[in-house]
Amino acid sequence: MFEARLVQGSILKKVLEALKDLINEACWDISSGGVNLQSMDSSHVSLVQLTLRSEGFDTYRCDRNLAMGVNLTSMSKILKCAGNEDIITLRAEDNADTLALVFEAPNQEKVSDYEMKLMDLDVEQLGIPEQEYSCVVKMPSGEFARICRDLSHIGDAVVISCAKDGVKFSASGELGNGNIKLSQTSNVDKEEEAVTIEMNEPVQLTFALRYLNFFTKATPLSPTVTLSMSTDVPLVVEYKISDMGHLKYYLAPKIEDEEGS
């Protein structure tokens, strides 16, 4: 039996909004430690890794490990039926072919319950190696979303250049080019408004904006985002989920000679 209750049900709604446009279906690995999801996107370009630790839920019970194949579009449709203030409970029997979702309005006068059919998914787990990064940039998540959106009007790809004093985002296309530079902030009262850069060596990498704009759908989950970069390894875009986990996206850099791709 698996049962998890989340008083702040809006977190689950935001997680599904952040996943559904990138991944159609995925396996939710449920264990006593929490809920994990790892999946390549539909076109096998990027990788998504979600962790929701059991202690972040208000009550959590998992008698034995489960692997639930979920159609994320379907789950997103059901979660749209939950109000932002609703308490959400997920429930499944040990070898069930459905997942129950129960939404309780905070005033307790309305309870909705839905059953979603699960899928049989054949999933290969990819090992994500631990990695030291040359450059780690932490910045307001809304700012990153805006930069990606603005530069996608200029070109298809963004060059991210990271140096000690700041990080620069550049794009070029038929209409011209655009550059946005953020300097490290020294004294900001609110931590979530700061730009911090930890740099071992400078990095300059190119990424497809189409995917970064998918990743920024996770912006409502966290006031800050962390970008971790090294030459020749995938960029990691990480959104912390309050005190219960994280959502990480991995995207390989574009090789310079891939013109027109």
UniProtKB/Swiss-Prot annotation:
Modifications made to the protein after synthesis: Phosphorylated. Phosphorylation at Tyr-211 by EGFR stabilizes chromatin-associated PCNA.
Keywords annotated in UniProt: Acetylation, Disulfide bond, DNA damage, DNA repair, DNA replication, DNA-binding, Isopeptide bond, Methylation, Nucleus, Phosphoprotein, Ubl conjugation
Residue ranges of DNA binding: 61-80
Keyword DNA damage: yes
Crosslinked positions (Glycyl lysine isopeptide (Lys-Gly) (interchain with G-Cter in ubiquitin)): 164
Listed Pfam families: PCNA_C, PCNA_N
Disulphide linkage map: 135-162
In-chain residues carrying the UniProt-annotated modification N6-acetyllysine: 14, 77, 80, 248
GO cellular component: centrosome; chromatin; cyclin-dependent protein kinase holoenzyme complex; male germ cell nucleus; nuclear body; nuclear lamina; nuclear replication fork; PCNA complex
Cited InterPro entries: DNA_clamp_sf, Pr_cel_nuc_antig, Pr_cel_nuc_antig_C, Pr_cel_nuc_antig_CS, Pr_cel_nuc_antig_N
Cross-link (Glycyl lysine isopeptide (Lys-Gly) (interchain with G-Cter in SUMO2)): 164, 254
GO molecular function: chromatin binding; damaged DNA binding; dinucleotide insertion or deletion binding; DNA polymerase binding; DNA polymerase processivity factor activity; histone acetyltransferase binding; identical protein binding; MutLalpha complex binding
Residue numbers bearing the Phosphotyrosine modification: 211
Subcellular location: Nucleus
A GO biological process held by the record: base-excision repair, gap-filling
Primary subcellular site in the record, as a coarse category: nucleus
Superkingdom of the organism of origin: Eukaryota
Family indicated by similarity: Belongs to the PCNA family.
Protein task: Auxiliary protein of DNA polymerase delta and epsilon, is involved in the control of eukaryotic DNA replication by increasing the polymerase's processibility during elongation of the leading strand. Induces a robust stimulatory effect on the 3'-5' exonuclease and 3'-phosphodiesterase, but not apurinic-apyrimidinic (AP) endonuclease, APEX2 activities. Has to be loaded onto DNA in order to be able to stimulate APEX2.
Subunit structure: Homotrimer. Interacts with p300/EP300; the interaction occurs on chromatin in UV-irradiated damaged cells. Interacts with CREBBP (via transactivation domain and C-terminus); the interaction occurs on chromatin in UV-irradiated damaged cells. Directly interacts with POLD1, POLD3 and POLD4 subunits of the DNA polymerase delta complex, POLD3 being the major interacting partner; the interaction with POLD3 is inhibited by CDKN1A/p21(CIP1). Forms a complex with activator 1 heteropentamer in the presence of ATP. Interacts with EXO1, POLH, POLK, DNMT1, ERCC5, FEN1, CDC6 and POLDIP2.
Protein name: Proliferating cell nuclear antigen
Organism of origin: Cricetulus griseus
